Amino acid sequence: MIDLEALPHLPGCYLFKNEEGTVIYVGKAKDLKKRVSSYFQKREHDPKTASLIEAVRGFDFIVTNTEVEAFLLENTLIKKHWPRYNILLKDSKRYACIHLTEEKFPRIRLSRKKADNGSFFGPFVSAKERDYIFEVVRKTFQLRTCKKMPKRACLRYHIAACSGPCIGAISAEDYAEKVKKAASVLKGNIRELIESMEKDMRELASRQQFEQAMALRDEIAALEYLQEKQNMERQKKHNEDILNYIVRDDTVYLMLFKVYKGTLEDKQDYVFAFGENFLEEFLVQYYSENEPPEELILPEPLEESLVDFLSHVKGTKVKVTVPKQGEKKELLDLALKNVEIGFFGDRKKLEALQSKLSLPKLPNVIECFDISHLSGTSTVGSMVQFRGGRPDKHNYRRFKIESVEGIDDFASIAEVVRRRYSRLLEDKHDLPDLIIIDGGKGQLSSAFQELRKLKVRVPLISIAKREEEIYVPGIKSPLPIKKEEKASLFVQEIRDEAHRFAITYNRLLRQKSMIPKND
């Protein structure tokens, strides 16, 4: 089942996934909750959308600061995942940029392709917005647009739309100053320029040159419109990782943004136990397996020895930045916002489950078991673990059933539960806060008997597929929890993930069995 409660009323992108966890559709939204919810309301859909909804088994989302950023991020995610349901719906062209060429008298133009020469700004999602910005900058700074310098002044010069470098009406130095200001505006650094223009406007008004003052006023208004920054796609030639976290109840909730050449391409989230040097330990483990970026943006500084370690792994200097203001600080804050919304929206699910099941503590670690087989062959068990309300795939486990002949889900559940928790006890690892069994009262009873033999005292429930009924040991009737309630939806989400994982393993074993063996 799809639990929509975790979605915020904020702009961002959503990623629909199928039974195998593959991204099949990427969309953007001004309001994530409203947009995603609209798919699952009971109403008629066109055949393509109906097919999409039928295939959806889960989703992820990334919050952005603005709808414009959501547009840009959507474009990036589509090109990364190439989702099945986006291919025929999205234009494969890049959004157009504004280009200042690299010439003695640079010209301003629109371009969909970023070449090596000159400066590029954007891209812009809306053609209307892009054209508006282009015209404002071109007109304000009277920049040339002609491909070749004409030998005589054109109409644009005569209507004061161009400064006329072709006829020597402006020096190269003065023209370069105009280009510099235009670039500053296109980068979003326009506050000082606006203040200067406001001063000029007041002087014009004091001299009763009201027409010129009003024209300047309109240009200032146009420039102010440009101040909305596009954090998701910046002009960087190097890669950045942006990391932020929250520590709560001795647990670290961490978000990692991956920025590739100025474009936010991915987010990764982690939940683990708090320790005195948790950040150092995380960075060492993560970057021992993943190449460090050119720049690492963090909420706190690192020891010099750790920076040296990262540089050694990369083979070149890694820059560590702790921004206090500006665009990088905004991205760091955006990562934190995603931690708060992504993880602590999930906390509400945990609290609902704790309340409905009368659990002694918040079920921060939940393990769920499922059995999958095909006509009694390739019978496998799966176990998924949710930590902090989210899948912790590092702790997923697969079990090839060894002691059961034919179809016997009860005996199969007993085997995987016995193997899992006897191993945890032997290795002296922590037990989960809740165990879920995919099945009815029979599977629940089998699991309960094995746990009792092992003297494992962990809350145990099962969920039956058809009516999504939840059972606990010792009570014949299902718990009075409606399948549409938050607690039930969360259990269904976990069960569906265990089922998906089991089916994936089952398919893998069947494929291997079909490969001829060499004599």
UniProtKB/Swiss-Prot annotation:
SUPFAM superfamilies: C-terminal UvrC-binding domain of UvrB, GIY-YIG endonuclease. CDD domains: GIY-YIG_UvrC_Cho. Residues 9-87 form the GIY-YIG domain. InterPro entries: GIY-YIG_endonuc, GIY-YIG_endonuc_sf, GIY-YIG_UvrC_Cho, UVR_dom, UVR_dom_sf, UvrABC_protein_C, UvrC, UvrC_RNase_H_dom. Its main location: cytoplasm. It is found in: Cytoplasm. It comes from the Archaea. Residues 191-226 form the UVR domain. GO terms for cellular component: cytoplasm; excinuclease repair complex. Transmembrane segments: none annotated. The keyword Cytoplasm applies. GO terms for molecular function: DNA binding; excinuclease ABC activity. GO terms for biological process: nucleotide-excision repair; SOS response. Keywords: Cytoplasm, DNA damage, DNA excision, DNA repair, Excision nuclease, SOS response. The UvrABC repair system catalyzes the recognition and processing of DNA lesions. UvrC both incises the 5' and 3' sides of the lesion. The N-terminal half is responsible for the 3' incision and the C-terminal half is responsible for the 5' incision. Belongs to the UvrC family. Interacts with UvrB in an incision complex. This is UvrABC system protein C. The gene is uvrC.
